[in-house]
Amino acid sequence: IKFQKRCPRELLTEEQYNAPHPNPVNSYGATYGAHREFLEFTVDQHAQLKEWCEEVGISYSTSVWDMTSAKEIAGLKPKFIKIPSACNTHYMMLQWLCDNYEGEIQLSFGMTTREEEQTIVKLFEENGRAKDLVIFNCTSGYPVPFRDVCLLEINRLREMYENRVKAIGFSGHHLGIAVDVAAYTLGASIIERHYT
């Protein structure tokens, strides 16, 4: 099971952090930043979630959205850490993980150019970590209509990277499970789904 970890102070500009929530009736803080802080689990809460997962035989992991979160979650030593599409060109964070985190790194390629894909895989290869890298075909959107899923990208990723990385996966942002079955049939060995 995968959670998410963000450091709002690192991700938001001062102006964004201090702006009022766009829908104050749904806000958990006086500002948008305070609202985001309220929604985040602390590192101690993540440690507790990891413990509960392990007690019932589930692998715990977290998507990290910034350097602070990457360092905090790496300290918990999960089996894998996920890099969301929105952060996959945060090369300083990727380098830090290559240098300081020994587990598997799963990374989505939504919103990523082919040149960026090559740069990312090359970074992991140059650091001797490509065989710890799982890359995911992903169409960024919630929910993604079936016609926009771009499943055949799995074939392209397999052709280009299957022998260079640990695995090719599929990150589904669609409704239902039919697309997951098709992704598996096309060779995605890991299927990631979003429940919330």
Give, region by region, the residue ranges found by the protein language model.
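Catalytic cores and adjacent flexible loops of soluble metabolic enzymes
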Residues: 1-196
